Amino acid sequence: MAGVDEVGRGCLAGPVFAAAVILNDNISIKGIKDSKKIPFKKRILLSKYIKKNSVYAIGSVSVKEINKTNILHASLLSMKRALKKLKQEPAVAYIDGPFAPKNIKIKCKTVIKGDEKITCIAAASIIAKVSRDLFMIKLGRKYPKYLWNKNFGYGTNDHLRGLKKYGITKHHRKKFRPIHNILISKTRETQ
């Protein structure tokens, strides 16, 4: 069985990432739970351990794709991409949340708060979170004014201050309200 979870759904900037994880039968992971509740450094160590003891894959959906559709579709697409990349096909994939990807030959079961209930979903949550956080840290080096190395693209006060002062980048999600409002106000200013 595989566990699948996505991260970055509520961010104002950056892609959505998902991971699909099939844990080795003999693995024992202490302290595994929802990735958002684990300190950053411990998450990195857990991610490395999980990767060594599993079959896993990561899928992502770019900001360009998110801007063309909606965040729910993007989240499901990232999960679908992760599942399709798995080198081993699971009999069933347990998906965190109420929705599962469509048009995929793997049987999917949704589990509300699955990252708190099923170990392979929690493992997927950790791998997805670490992968996306590291991506945003790297991207933040090119755009230091938004402090993505600390907020990872979420709508923190620092990020919102950066948006107000410097405007948006191509990595911001144009349909998300704070970004959309900035675009509208800029349009009004130029008319």
Regions found by a protein language model. Give the residues of each.
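RNase H-like, Mg2+-dependent phosphodiesterase core
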Residues: 1-191
